[in-house]
Structures are given as C-alpha cells and as structure tokens.
C-alpha cells in the first residue's frame, strides 16, 4: 500500500509552519521538511510542500497515480472539489479519470485527519498499550482549531474523544502564555517542551509562576495574564 501525506493541506487559507511531506510504500518511509529542501524556513510563497513530495516519490520510485491514500490535515475553509480536482489532475496527475467520476475517487482516496488526534495517535501507536486514555494539549493546534485540548480513550484501534475544551483559560494556553512571556513566538514555543527535561526546577521561579495560575473544581484552570502586562 502507498500513502502520501502533506502538511499543510493544499488550498488551505491559513498560514502554517514547518511544511512537510511523508510517503509510505509498504515498509519504506520517506519523510522530510520543505524548508530543508528549499533552504527557506516557513516560506510564505509556498502553499504546500510540493518539492518534498516529489522528492519522496523519486526516492521510493513511485508515480502520483500509484498512491492508494492521500492524507491531509483538516482545512479551516470548506472543501471545494473543483480545487482538489485541479490539484490531482494538474499539479500531481494522480487522477486520470473523467471529471464526473472525480467525487467518487476523491472520497475513496483522500482522508482528512484531526490535528490534535494525530498527536494522540502518535503517542498511542508508539506505545505498547492495547488500550489507554489520552490527553492532548496542543493549544490551538492547527490555527483554525478552536479547541485547547482533547481528552478521550483508545481501544480496539479506535480513538474516542470524550471531552473538548474550547475556552481560553486552560493549561495549554497557560503554557503558551509563559513561553510568549519569555520571548518565544507562537510557532516556536513547542521547543521549550523538548528542552524542559534538561532543565532544573528553580524553587523561587516555581513559586512565582504558581502565583499566576489557579486550579479549582468549580472554575477549572484560571490564570492571570496581567502580571506580565500581556493581555492577549
């Protein structure tokens, strides 16, 4: 089976970061970032990782019309078949049929995935658990996603979302608030999570940070943003 994955989704109206493409052919995997091919990080003139995808096809010796499943993140804008018909017939020539049959082909070959759920899937599939609970706190995730975090369970190869947070005051945005306060941009604050395991707890700083947040059964998570003169 051959699977091709793109981030971001073609024709998505929102700006994204770290464009990338992955191609899977049986047990072989090609995955790369567009910026490493073009040497331009987060290139604003590019709307999807075209060069990386073509490089993956070349490395695995396949043609676009051999792909069994195309995987895209769910776009913020409505899905317009005419746009995707252009994409699959002109840009990559993955579809060679009649325009009247395109919708059927599209429904069979294209899959849109939940951004936050993809993080939960990576953790669950990479573990040894046959069933587990998951909590994904990705803040905005894809910028068009209003959910701060999701909670659910994984069982029988199915992910079931039990709760979604759409408010502002939650632990994911608290993380963003703190990283913004020390100078990390919205696209880069995830790097602090990767570095956190190498740091040391500083009791004085921990005490000050705890003053900014309140957790209660009645109100959940609340945090004070005015401490650093940041209100949005």
Label every model-predicted segment:
Residues 1-232:
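Short acidic/glycine-rich loops and adjacent helix/strand connectors
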């Amino acid at each position: 089976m051959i699977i091709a994955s793109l981030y971001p989704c073609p024709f998505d109206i929102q700006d994204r970061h770290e464009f990338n493409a992955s191609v899977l052919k049986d047990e072989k995997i090609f995955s790369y970032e567009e910026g490493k091919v073009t040497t331009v990080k987060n290139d604003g003139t590019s709307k999807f990782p075209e060069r990386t995808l073509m490089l993956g096809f070349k490395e695995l010796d396949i043609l676009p019309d051999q792909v069994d499943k195309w995987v895209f993140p769910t776009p913020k804008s409505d899905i317009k078949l005419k746009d995707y018909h252009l994409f699959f017939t002109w840009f990559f020539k993955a579809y060679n049929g009649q325009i009247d049959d395109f919708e059927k082909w599209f429904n069979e070959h294209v899959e849109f995935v939940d951004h936050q759920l993809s993080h939960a899937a990576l953790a669950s599939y990479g573990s040894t658990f046959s069933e587990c609970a998951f909590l994904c706190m990705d803040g905005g995730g894809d910028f068009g996603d209003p959910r701060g975090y999701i909670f659910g369970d994984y069982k029988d190869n199915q992910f079931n979302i039990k709760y979604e947070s759409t408010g502002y005051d939650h632990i994911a945005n608290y993380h963003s608030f703190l990283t913004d306060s020390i100078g990390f941009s919205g696209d880069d604050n995830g790097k602090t999570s990767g570095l956190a395991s190498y740091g040391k707890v500083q009791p004085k700083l921990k005490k000050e940070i705890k003053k900014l947040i309140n957790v209660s059964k009645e109100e959940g998570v609340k945090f004070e943003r005015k401490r650093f003169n940041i209100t949005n």
